[in-house]
């Protein structure tokens, strides 16, 4: 969706190299940087062509260089190109919920047009320092392992690390569900350079788990914006901004707490690198664009809390060749407030969510922010699990009987803690048959303190598996006893 000015400014295409389009405009009527240019007409075969480009460079001699947001197939030199007089605009507001959009804000889900008068440009300045909410506030998710060990910051940015099949999508959907029910918030998902199949699977899973209400889209809790792997680099580079623009409207105008998911932030950087090379810029370290820090900063600095509302962002991060010093993840890490690492080992044990309690980190886990009680409980849980991890080699070689009484007690409690970190999800009800549970932070801390203090040493460890709060674990133990 592109805005147009009343006085039409028309130029002519002079050169096309892949997704890069050069155009000449009349003297004194040059388009601004980031303006959307529109090409509409017929190609040599008589088929309709409609392409939107974004101005990236003013070359001199009345020439501009733009990057196309879709395929340039069918474009020829001499075709008319119109300056819309404004950046790319996308629809915003309640009408976007339950729908899938492309980079231009056009619906691509065969559900008909989007009826909204509200649109916003994808290029905007980050909020002013004076408008920011700088008080560190914990964002309660209702997921025990996250709230206790890697608390999310309201308006913070969290990196989600995990391979295929360990539960990234399910955690994302549960967060979307919980924020909608318990915070009155909404979510926006930006699929940046993701596989078309994955995007389709996510959409269908969200319909199945009622995150998207196919019968009444107004009751949906999420808007989806996709720029898939087969799209030109311009679209993949800008789709994150389109998703962010929709999220900003919910924060600034509707004054809501918003969850913004970006999958994958590495592909955003990769697309920027491709565009940079196409524009003839000298590559920087490892072939990345020289503007890497600026590109990432422009996106990340707009994701923040203001006095009106917050955007809390969960970003999937791919690490090339597991090299954390690669410029792409290294630049991203500088902006993150926490990391949630998913473990295949835990997933293989059937412990879901498979969040690694020892590898995951958060800047919020400080006594001065979360309080002494929360901090001490979290550290005690981690030290118990760490000791259990150290003892596993001895157990594997010599057996449990060779451990001291104290170590046996640690192993017993650690196994209970490990199982109590699991939790039934609302969005997984249709698959597991177990009703989902939202656990408050207060109940989470209370439960783990009781396990570590030894109050529940007489309960079997099965009682702690896939339950909500500690009262439910006690009830399950009673039921197991009767059976």
Swiss-Prot record:
Known catalytic reactions: ATP + H2O + 4 H(+)(in) = ADP + phosphate + 5 H(+)(out)
Superkingdom of the organism of origin: Bacteria
Membrane topology, record value: Peripheral membrane protein
Positions annotated to bind ATP: 162-169
Keywords from the named record: ATP synthesis, ATP-binding, CF(1), Hydrogen ion transport, Ion transport, Membrane, Nucleotide-binding, Thylakoid, Translocase, Transport
EC number: 7.1.2.2
Main location: membrane
UniProt xrefs under Pfam families: ATP-synt_ab, ATP-synt_ab_N, ATP-synt_VA_C
Location of the protein in the cell: Cellular thylakoid membrane
PROSITE patterns: ATPASE_ALPHA_BETA
GO CC term (a single one): proton-transporting ATP synthase complex
UniProt cross-references to InterPro entries, sorted A to Z: AAA+_ATPase, ATP-synt_VA_C, ATP_synth_F1_bsu, ATPase_a/bsu_AS, ATPase_alpha/beta_chains, ATPase_F1/V1/A1_a/bsu_N, ATPase_F1/V1/A1_a/bsu_N_sf, ATPase_F1/V1/A1_a/bsu_nucl-bd
GO MF annotation terms: ATP binding; ATP hydrolysis activity; proton-transporting ATP synthase activity, rotational mechanism
Function: Produces ATP from ADP in the presence of a proton gradient across the membrane. The catalytic sites are hosted primarily by the beta subunits.
HAMAP family per UniProt: ATP_synth_beta_bact
NCBIfam families xref list: atpD
Subunit organization: F-type ATPases have 2 components, CF(1) - the catalytic core - and CF(0) - the membrane proton channel. CF(1) has five subunits: alpha(3), beta(3), gamma(1), delta(1), epsilon(1). CF(0) has four main subunits: a(1), b(1), b'(1) and c(9-12).
Family named by the database record: Belongs to the ATPase alpha/beta chains family.
PANTHER family for this protein: ATP SYNTHASE, ATP SYNTHASE SUBUNIT BETA, MITOCHONDRIAL
Protein name per the record: ATP synthase subunit beta
Organism of provenance: Prochloron didemni
């Amino acid at each position: 969706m592109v805005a147009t000015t009343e006085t039409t400014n028309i130029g002519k295409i002079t050169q096309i190299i892949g997704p890069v389009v050069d155009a000449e405009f009349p003297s004194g009527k040059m388009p601004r940087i980031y303006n959307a240019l529109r090409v509409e007409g017929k190609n040599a075969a008589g088929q309709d062509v409609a392409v939107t480009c974004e101005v990236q460079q003013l070359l001199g001699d009345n020439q501009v260089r733009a990057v196309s947001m879709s395929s340039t197939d069918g474009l020829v030199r001499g075709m008319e190109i119109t300056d819309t007089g404004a950046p790319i605009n996308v629809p915003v507001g309640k009408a976007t919920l339950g729908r899938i959009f492309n980079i231009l804000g056009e619906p691509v889900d065969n559900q008909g047009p989007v009826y909204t008068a509200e649109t916003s440009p994808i290029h905007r300045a980050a909020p002013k320092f004076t408008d920011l909410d700088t008080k560190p506030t914990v964002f309660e998710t209702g997921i025990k392992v996250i709230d206790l060990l890697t608390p999310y910051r309201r308006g913070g940015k969290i990196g989600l690390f995990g391979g295929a099949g360990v539960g990234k999508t399910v955690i994302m959907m549960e967060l979307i569900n919980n924020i909608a029910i318990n915070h009155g918030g909404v979510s926006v998902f930006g699929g940046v350079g993701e596989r078309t199949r994955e995007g389709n699977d996510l959409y269908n899973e969200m319909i199945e788990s009622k995150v998207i209400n196919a019968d009444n889209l107004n009751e949906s809790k999420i808007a989806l914006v996709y720029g898939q792997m087969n799209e030109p680099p311009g679209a993949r580079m800008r789709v994150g901004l389109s998703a962010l623009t929709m999220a900003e409207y919910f924060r600034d105008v509707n004054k809501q707490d918003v969850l913004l998911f970006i999958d994958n932030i590495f592909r955003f950087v990769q697309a920027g690198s491709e565009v940079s090379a196409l524009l003839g810029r000298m590559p920087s370290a490892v072939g990345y664009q020289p503007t890497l820090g600026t590109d990432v900063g422009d996106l990340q600095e707009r994701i923040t809390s203001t006095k009106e509302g917050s955007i809390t962002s969960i970003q999937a991060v791919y690490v090339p060749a597991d090299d954390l010093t690669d410029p792409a993840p290294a630049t991203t890490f500088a902006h993150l407030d926490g990391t949630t690492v998913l473990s295949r080992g835990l997933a293989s044990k059937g412990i879901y969510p498979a969040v690694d309690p020892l590898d995951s980190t958060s800047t919020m886990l400080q006594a001065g922010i979360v309080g002494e009680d929360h901090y001490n409980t979290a550290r005690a849980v981690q030290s118990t699990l760490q000791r259990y991890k150290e003892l596993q080699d001895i157990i594997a070689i010599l057996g449990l009987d060779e451990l001291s009484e104290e170590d046996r007690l640690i192993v017993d409690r650690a196994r209970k803690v490990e199982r109590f970190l699991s939790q039934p999800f609302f969005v997984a009800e249709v698959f597991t048959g177990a009703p989902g549970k939202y656990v408050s932070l207060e109940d989470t801390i209370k439960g783990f303190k009781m396990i570590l203090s030894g109050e529940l040493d007489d309960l079997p460890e099965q009682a702690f598996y896939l339950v909500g709060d500690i009262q439910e674990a006690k009830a399950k133990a009673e039921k197991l006893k009767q059976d």
